[in-house]
């Protein structure tokens, strides 16, 4: 079967950025930046992004482009005879399924709230009534199931339409719209009464506030966010590397993807902080920020229905862009493992992903009795822990060791692949850090995640 390729360089960059850009850019990064000293946190975040995320992204892209295979088959094309690196390929596929087991539900929340806001169902509600809307949604398995299934159907239908005519075409439009909506929302925030105070809190470095939270805690938080924001370790980037030519170096392309992801994360704060300071609302993180705090602000804002609708449309696009990217990975792996057509692989995965996503939906209602808990939390929290604290760091470590050590693909092969084409290059002076320093940092992130979950 002849391998498909992306039609344009822009399509590759937007698809890769769409995979990296997700809800964490909005409901986690601004809060961490605000609490961690504003500009001080942002500065350290950018440093760690360059030191951690960027190199590993080049490695995923390199494995994909050199092999021209899906992640589940890529190692077999590059490893030496008798080696077992290809076992990790199956773990990348498992990680993608696990991510979709809860991400489809969260993406459904975004679509639900876009509908609720656009139709005016949240207009004029009191703060308690807005909070109650979120609680009622979680308690209703029918509503949760409907939106989750809709997300899966949308994702599979688009991917089944083909790489160029389906995934690439839709993602281009969606990502450009996402960026445009963000800019409009940010400009609107600049004209709010509390914009000056909010932007000062967010962007001006405040090392005193950083010390109040704890310097070590803030640095580890910046390191974790820089590492996890790019969705590395489960082959989600490698698949797009397999769809491109060798006209441009992979370091240069990775920089462009990282810049887009960072733009979205920082711009999210430009939207949120002025609004919170204008309306005297404590800035929180996670679902409470998105589904309680901000809807309350929109309810009291002039033209709040318009701005709220735009915000949740942006959030829906951010979630769907990740869903589409991971679906493409899953569907392509299915095609290569079974020899099935794109449409057949899409159809099988439509039902499989819906079935796998049901526990997350029911974990908030039907299965939410006191005796049912996974490590003391909801099903979503457990699935998120497995992906974020196991599959991403350990998967990234495998890609890293495969690319830079003589026991895998090897430094010279990696360097040759990543440097092919015009653009920024990887140099030999980086080898010591990538071979010795970076693996230790990734191991630290993994161990800290385990400690933070079970022993803190």
Annotate each language-model stretch with its function.
Residues 3-4, 32-36, 66-91, 104-164, ...:
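Inter-helical loop and helix-membrane interface segments of multi-pass membrane transporters/permeases
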Residues 5-16, 41-44, 84-97, 145-151, ...:
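Select transmembrane alpha-helical segments in multipass membrane proteins
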């Amino acid at each position: 079967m002849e391998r498909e390729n992306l039609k344009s360089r822009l399509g590759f960059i937007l698809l890769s950025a769409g995979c990296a850009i997700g809800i964490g850019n909005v409901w986690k990064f601004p809060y961490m930046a605000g609490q961690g000293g504003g500009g001080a946190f942002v500065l350290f975040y950018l440093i760690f992004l360059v030191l951690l995320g960027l190199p590993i992204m080049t490695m995923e892209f390199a494995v994909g482009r050199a092999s021209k295979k899906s992640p589940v088959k890529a190692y077999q094309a590059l490893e030496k005879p008798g080696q077992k690196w290809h076992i990790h390929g199956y773990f990348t596929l498992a990680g993608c399924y696990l991510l979709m087991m809860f991400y489809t539900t969260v993406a459904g929340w975004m679509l639900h709230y876009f509908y609720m806001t656009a139709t005016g169902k949240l207009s004029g509600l009191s703060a308690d009534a807005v909070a109650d809307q979120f609680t009622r949604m979680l308690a209703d398995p029918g509503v949760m199931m409907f939106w989750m299934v809709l997300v899966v159907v949308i994702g599979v239908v688009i991917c089944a339409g083909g790489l160029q005519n389906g995934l690439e075409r839709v993602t281009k439009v969606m990502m450009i719209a996402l960026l445009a909506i963000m800019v409009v929302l940010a400009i609107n925030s600049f004209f709010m009464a509390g914009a000056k105070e909010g932007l000062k809190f967010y962007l001006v470095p405040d090392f005193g506030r950083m010390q109040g939270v704890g310097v070590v805690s803030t640095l580890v938080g910046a390191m974790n966010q820089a590492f996890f924001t790019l969705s590395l370790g489960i082959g989600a980037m490698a698949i797009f590397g397999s769809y491109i030519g060798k006209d441009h170096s992979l370091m240069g392309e990775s920089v462009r993807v990282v810049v887009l992801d960072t733009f979205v994360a920082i711009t999210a704060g430009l939207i949120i902080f002025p609004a919170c300071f204008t309306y005297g609302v404590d800035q929180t993180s996670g679902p409470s920020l998105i589904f309680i705090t901000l809807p309350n602000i929109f309810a009291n804002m002039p033209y709040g229905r318009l701005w709220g609708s735009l915000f949740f449309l942006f959030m829906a696009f951010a979630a769907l862009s990740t869903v589409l990217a991971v679906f493409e990975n899953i569907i392509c792996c299915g095609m290569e493992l079974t020899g099935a057509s794109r449409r057949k692989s899409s159809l099988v995965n439509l039902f499989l992903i819906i079935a796998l996503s049901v526990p997350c939906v029911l974990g908030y209602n039907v299965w939410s009795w006191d005796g049912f808990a996974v490590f003391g939390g909801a099903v979503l929290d457990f699935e998120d822990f497995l992906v974020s604290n196991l599959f991403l760091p350990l998967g990234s470590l495998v890609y890293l060791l495969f690319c830079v050590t003589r026991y895998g693909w090897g430094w010279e092969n990696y360097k040759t692949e990543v440097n092919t084409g015009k653009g920024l290059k990887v140099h030999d002076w980086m080898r010591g850090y990538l071979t010795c320093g970076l693996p230790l940092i990734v191991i630290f992130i993994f161990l800290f995640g385990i400690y933070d979950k079970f022993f803190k």
